[in-house]
Amino acid sequence: YRLSLDENKSLDGSDTTQTVGVGVPVYFYFKLNSVKLVDKSQLANLDEIVKIAKEKDLTIHISGAADSATGTNGVNRHLSKERARYIGKLLIKKGISKERLKAVSLGGISQFSPKEANRFTLVLLTK
């Protein structure tokens, strides 16, 4: 099973650049060049995300990223997609339907300092 996604496109192909969230985004941080979380305790947030999404009938937006300071553009695009897929698959295993997920790959970014802070998957609930 593969969760498909494209840069700035949701699973249904629509543009996701104008997404407005409900509540606060949740970040999952990853090790360098990996889809392994820095700390597995971060996964405790998934149960609450699933509970709220189901109770409030919300869509879950997933954005994967890599730090642009390491790796090539191609490697970072691939890595950011795999990070988003990883979190998406975990949400599906916890009972979220694929139709409720919108996933994007941000590729390599340098938005945050230190550079390790750019190795993430962000989860945002939306109406």
What are the functions of these language-model segments?
Residues 36, 40, 65-127:
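Periplasmic OmpA-like peptidoglycan-binding domain that tethers envelope proteins to the cell wall
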Residues 1-59, 117, 121-127:
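Periplasmic peptidoglycan-binding/tethering modules of Gram-negative envelope proteins
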